Amino acid sequence: MQKDKKNYKLRKFGPITERRDYSITKHSLPVGDILATSKKSYQDFINKKIEELLNEIYPIEASNKEASLEYEKKSVKFELPFKKAEHENLQIKTCKAKKTNFSMKVYITLKKVVSQTGVVKKEKILLGEIPYITSSGSFIINGSEKVIVSQLIRSPGAYFGVSVRNKQSEDLFNKLEILPRIGSWIEVSHKVTSANLDAIKIKIDKNKNINIVTFLASFGLLADDIRYLFGKNEVLEETIRKNKTIDITEFSRQEIMDLCQEKIFRIIRKGDRISEESKRSLLSGMLFDKKRYNLSKTGRYMLNNKLSLVERITNTYLAQKVVSHLGNTFDVGTYVTYEIAKEIQESFEAKAKDNKSNLHLEKIPNINPDDVYYKINKDNKSLNKRINIARIKIWPTKRAMDANETPSEVIGNDPKATEEHLLLSDIIAAISYYLNLTVGIGQDDDPDSLMNKRIVSVGELLEGELRIALLKLEKATRERMGAKEPDKITAKNVTNNKLITNQMKTFFNTSKLAQFMDQINPLAEISNKRRVTSLGPGGLNRDTAQFEVRDVHSTHYGRICPIETPEGPNIGLILNYAIYSTVNELGFLQTPYYKVNDGVVDYNDVRYLTSYEEIGYAFAQSSVHVNDKNEIIDEQITIKKDYNYIIGSPKDIDFLEVSSKQIVSVAAAAIPFLENNDANRALMGSNMQRQAVPLIEAEAPLVATGIEADIAKFSSYNIVANNDGEVIYVDGTKIQVRTAKKIDTYNLKNFEKSNQGTIIQQKPIVKVGDHVKEGDLLVDGSSFKDGEMALGKNLLVGFTTWNGYNFEDAIIINERLVKDDVLTSIYIEEQTIQFRISKSSEDIMTRDIPNVSKYSMRNLDEFGIIKVGSEVVAGDVLVGRISPKGEENPSQEEKLLNAIFNQRPQNYKDTSLKVKNGHNGTVIHVEVLSRENGDILEDGLDSIIKVYIAQKRKIKVGDKMAGRHGNKGVISIILPEEDMPHLEDGTPLDIMLNPQGVPSRMNIGQVLEMHLGMAAKKLGTKFVTPSFDGIKKETIEDLLQEANLDKSGKQVVIDPITGEKFDNPISVGVIYMLKLNHMVDDKMHARSVGPYSLITQQPLGGKSQNGGQRFGEMETWALESYGASNILQEILTYKSDDIYSRNLVYKALVNDSAIPNPGMPESFNVLSNELKGLLMKLGITETESNSDELIQHFDHLGVEHE
């Protein structure tokens, strides 16, 4: 890195480009693999989760218990879709061509055990096929590249709400929800807005409310036990008073338990037969059985965190003397700080032999584990110990302590609990927390905080699908085993391996989370792989999602991008990871920080923290000034602590952000001067960069942000060296590198079609003799230049109006951009035809097509397939095919005679593949899949032919363009070079934008980019200006002067038509402009004759169906207001759905006779038939006797008349 005498450094971006860097942050953390999250999640799934699931499901015992199948531990074997890593791309190409899946086979070893004889027989079987992740983080399903989007959902755990509004009523409630990953939801609530105290009720799933005292009594806790446990609480007393079952003194504890269990059974299992067994096992099965209730590791972690004592006893006063496990004594009345609270909690967790504390876990009074964990504790004896709680007395305020009020009881759950299902201590601690909230102890939860949300990545989603499939497999296997003799059973004949394959197929083809990959350009692809959605199974619904859920939250900082989200109904529900964001093993989002010790930054100590772990620490921004000794030299700094901002000194800081772009996503980080733009426009800018089409000649921006080179490193459009070595061969199709052990060959992509029809092309950027290191770029893919992302072009822009042509954001461009192919892109269209074969008929490929002009078949070869390289226009035949009309089945004799005399019966019709309207171009590739070549095709298919047509699209009027700052517009006119305003040296402008588009949009970034771009062009250099650490206005002024330009950035511009200067100098500079994937060629559409709807007989709608334009109610008013009755009559009858009359009009036009009057529109008949369906007969009464023509017309239509 070369240091200049100026206040910048020259830094290298990519293998070639150097840029001037003026940023303050000197130690930005290098961007890691931006696609690592999904790849790591998938690897975790195949390495750990499959084994865990198989251990859960097996052994499977036959329904007659004569035999069982056991899984041999750690016997999972995978057959990957490629033998060596370097073959992966070749296999992916094959899967795309043959429309198959890129998947791996899963083999396991099962042991059959016969109960009577004890005979054991091992067998290796195929369990199924699971799609395999590519090295770029996508999946190939039926030949299409797909992405599994991560989901952001509420984490399992306990959540408390104070004065929450209920959906059904206007009342406010206190609420406790215990959410599992799998199992029954528990909701505890009581109304807080009514004049009288309300009883606390519990709801399990969506059943009726149960009084909480009845619920506790079903485990054996009576009124006195409840008062002893939870202390004095008026809401609790009211709940006990309103409960009728519990205070009846003549009943024993066991009888009360039975009564309460019966009452709960009748509510939850309404209508089911009740028995002693069923009522006792109901709650224990629903809440404490690990097979039916699963919190997951995350849920247990969340529950233990929330139900510990720390949160509730911090900032309170002790009402009992405490000796901690460290031997520290805290007297009655001690103010409890966060540190003391943690020490008290740890005293309950400490092992008995080292524990000097007077705090110990105590048993819940009068509880018998056999009643609570009925039947479950037979298999799991450790549950008998899980009736312990941590308990302490405190005063919530100093006033309560001084008044010597009755202390509050605070109960925590068993901190040693690791079970992934609920325990009685969890329920008691949760109810204690709920009651504490009524007296102001504890905190309610923010459902929108990332502390309470977790990421479900691809691995976990596939684990869920595999679990469903294995449960189906278990059931099917058990039934098959029961139906066979023990000695006839083999692992293979009772295991249906189609279940897993089909479950995966269904998920990848139908799930909302499996998306067709957005491949318009490399940024779109990376953005799609880093997307997070709150929708989907178990998530939110876009129609009911409230504003609060969609809003940016303070915990998103450094984890979720606050800018990149769609406009429209999904705003705030579909999000993107921030650049440095990672996911930990529990699914919580983390962001990295540098550790700061006593004002000194340790750049080697990078800590990844979740939003929960950030509590209690102080954080500083990355743009603080640091000296050579890594000491922070600013005296006063803005500090973030507990999600609030305060002013402090360097000594107060615990952590430092790792980069100024830490807050934003990859797409938002690619916007220069992001900090000078309004957030709404930045949102549009980041979304529109994803729509930029790759141009024929890529050009890197003069003003970049530095993220472009990082994107190049991790994009699947590029190829990086796998090993160190020397380049020994380079051409347009492959690169060979000699390494220490072997020769690595890298095959390049040429004219490949992306999912969206844009071109994927790779050009070598290395030469023979170059030495490359592992991870170095070897090629530039589409939209890359010299190892940097290059989505658009640097164009000379003037902000001026011109004869009203740039009204309302329209754009005026120079004809040079068309002539020199500056904004020309290539679009590839795939057209497919199938040849079917059956017993009675078959499609025939031929050049001999009836009733087709020779001109449209001029480029066919002798087989009837288009030649590669042919120029084709709409209507040209691509593949000749004739199909039987299907009226008659020829006899064997007729077939023989036709074959002998080489005759073709006349009942064949032309069903050839023809070029669609607007898809003119050059045939670049033809692909034939046939059974002859050994390709696997569907039943009834003999062959499939795919023709690829490339279309060169120059920029034209109606195309959409945009900058990187949300400044978008449509081209309104293309001016000849000689008519374009030019600078004093004769340089014509490339593009004219309306200056009125800047002030109200508040995206000033484009103005700064324009001035800096002009300086860059004049100085022959390039700049980097990272997000939130960009080049300052004063620096830009200095650079303009250095380039011998006016520091205002304005220049004299001459109107070539008059030769006069414009009245005032205008802002002229270089802006990076993008051509978007909204081209007029895809949108322009007209219809003369086309298809009609079957029922209404009205023309179809939309370009894809060659439909018409809807003439709606308001358009009818327009014609009515002008009195254009004849036109109106035509539009609503002949041209729409009057079938009979439209045929008469055609006849009249052919015969040159008078056009008849219109008749009855078909929609009238539809109405008449719908009324008949409602048993109403619609008839027509004539008043004129001379309307013979009308009578005939009604007779023809079948409408009754009098």
From Swiss-Prot:
One of its GO terms (biological process) is DNA-templated transcription. It comes from the Bacteria. Its EC number is 2.7.7.6. It catalyses: RNA(n) + a ribonucleoside 5'-triphosphate = RNA(n+1) + diphosphate. Keywords: DNA-directed RNA polymerase, Nucleotidyltransferase, Transcription, Transferase. One of its GO terms (cellular component) is DNA-directed RNA polymerase complex. GO terms for molecular function: DNA binding; DNA-directed RNA polymerase activity; ribonucleoside binding. InterPro entries: DNA-dir_RNA_pol_bsu_ext_1_sf (IPR042107), DNA-dir_RNA_pol_bsu_external_1 (IPR019462), DNA-dir_RNA_pol_su2 (IPR015712), DNA-dir_RNAP_su2_dom (IPR007120), DNA-dir_RNAP_su2_hyb_sf (IPR037033), RNA_pol_bsu_bac (IPR010243), RNA_pol_bsu_CS (IPR007121), RNA_pol_bsu_protrusion (IPR007644). CDD domains: RNA_pol_B_RPB2. DNA-dependent RNA polymerase catalyzes the transcription of DNA into RNA using the four ribonucleoside triphosphates as substrates. Belongs to the RNA polymerase beta chain family. This is DNA-directed RNA polymerase subunit beta.
